[in-house]
Amino acid sequence: MKSVNAPIMKKDAMALVTGKPVYTDDIAPKDCLVCKILRSQHAHAVIEEINTDIAMKVPGIECILTYEDVPDKRFTMAGQTYPEPSPYDRLILDRRVRFVGDAVAIVAGKTEEAVEKALKLIKVKYEVLEAVLDFHQAKDAKILVHPEENWKALCDVGADNKRNLCATGSEQNGDVDKILEDCDYVVEGTYHTQANQQAMMETFRTYKIGRAHV
């Protein structure tokens, strides 16, 4: 009980705040390419045209990928074991963008300066669509976030992309209505909590080393 209501320092706290641990970016090979993503400026839109010709001419640019270059095979970002309860709703790059900051193109180059320049030279023409901006109104709205036919859910968790539902469910213990009838006072309300992330602070990062360098 001596630890209850007492400040307990994490074992790695001092190392973290003084920058001693090694992160992925600290072990980048000298010849590693720099990759950055062109982000959508629209909350909901479909890419009508995307031109990377001028951007590809920037010295040092090795590759530019758009939705036309990636597999049309959806996957989930969930971390659960297979079969995941979260829907398979993501593409590496999608023709439809669903929020400000959604990925539009991936640029790889030899220097960060070259990649930044190329990002500014990619020309994108959008068909801007009405967006779902209020989660209270999202369910059964006329605007579908995922209207595509190859969206799927592997588990029966009440997911339905035609209703903007990634999952639905309820849990009840006992006769709730009967208990409420017997209460002298009943307080009803809608409550929200902030988003929480229980995982590490570092974002997803990967270095790929070709077989020739192994």
Model regions: which residues?
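Structural alpha/beta core scaffold segments of enzyme domains
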Residues: 1-211
